[in-house]
């Protein structure tokens, strides 16, 4: 996967204004759950991924499943070339009263507006790929719109470029960007709301490290492997 080409392509994308409601803060939703002793799960929808995942059901079918469970928010892949995503999926999910994270390779602050227009409440920024000033501009534009930002890192060195503001969450994605394998060691990092991403499934959820405020879970929920049901049964969410 050529990440540079994805970022260049994303600079050419746009999306017209189609919001039908105000912002719902994903960060505040997770904090509220934490206050009641729960963790926040962000359920992710994607049609395919470079790691080999392919799903054959629609965003509507996915939403009808996850909205029956106690999730904190939705993460929707909108990148078209490698994930077969679309801003239109955000428009569809926007009818539900739940925070939506627009997950994409956000190249600049202008792209934040497109996520907002589609109905997103938060955007993803990958610290590994952007310089500090670009990250700052994205976070500030999101703040202007009332949106949250999930600053994601894969390599711990990328944390040097994090930009902290009151609308920021910090996420560690366990998937190595070079070989797409999972890192079993989870680094220590600070933040008001910390999110663990990738690799959570029914096979390991019983050993879930509960020191995080939230968890972004994709493939296992898409496969309906019982992870959500287990987390509810144990009172974690």
Curated annotation (Swiss-Prot):
First-tier enzyme category under EC: lyase
Q: SUPFAM superfamilies per the record?
A: Ribulose-phoshate binding barrel
Pathway membership: Amino-acid biosynthesis; L-tryptophan biosynthesis; L-tryptophan from chorismate: step 4/5
Which GO molecular function terms does the record list?
A: indole-3-glycerol-phosphate synthase activity; phosphoribosylanthranilate isomerase activity
**BP GO terms, sorted:** L-tryptophan biosynthetic process
Q: What is its EC number?
A: 4.1.1.48
Record's keyword terms, sorted? Amino-acid biosynthesis, Aromatic amino acid biosynthesis, Decarboxylase, Lyase, Tryptophan biosynthesis
Show the Gene3D superfamilies listed in the entry: Aldolase class I
Identification of the protein by name: Indole-3-glycerol phosphate synthase
Q: Which organism is it from?
A: Thermoplasma volcanium (strain ATCC 51530 / DSM 4299 / JCM 9571 / NBRC 15438 / GSS1)
Q: Gene that codes for this?
A: trpC
């Amino acid at each position: 996967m050529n990440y540079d080409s994805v970022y260049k392509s994303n600079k050419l994308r746009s999306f017209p204004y189609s919001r039908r409601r105000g912002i719902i803060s994903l960060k505040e939703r997770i904090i509220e759950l934490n206050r009641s002793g729960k963790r926040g799960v962000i359920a992710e929808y994607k049609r395919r991924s470079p790691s080999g995942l392919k799903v054959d059901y629609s965003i509507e079918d996915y939403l009808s499943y996850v909205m029956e469970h106690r999730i904190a928010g939705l993460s929707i892949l909108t990148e078209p070339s490698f994930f077969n995503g679309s801003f239109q999926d955000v428009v569809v999910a926007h009818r539900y009263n739940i925070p939506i994270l627009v997950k994409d390779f956000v190249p600049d602050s202008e792209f934040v507006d497109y996520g907002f227009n589609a109905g997103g409440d938060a955007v993803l920024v990958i610290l590994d790929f952007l310089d500090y000033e670009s990250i700052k501009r994205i976070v500030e534009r999101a703040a202007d719109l009332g949106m949250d930002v999930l600053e994601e890192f894969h390599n711990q060195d990328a944390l040097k470029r994090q930009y902290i503001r009151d609308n920021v969450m910090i996420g560690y994605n366990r998937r190595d960007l070079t070989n797409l394998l999972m890192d079993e060691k989870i680094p220590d990092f600070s933040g008001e709301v910390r999110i663990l991403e990738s690799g959570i499934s029914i096979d390991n959820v019983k050993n879930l490290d509960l020191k995080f405020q939230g968890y972004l879970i994709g493939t296992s929920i898409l496969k309906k492997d019982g992870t959500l049901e287990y987390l509810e049964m144990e009172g974690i969410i």
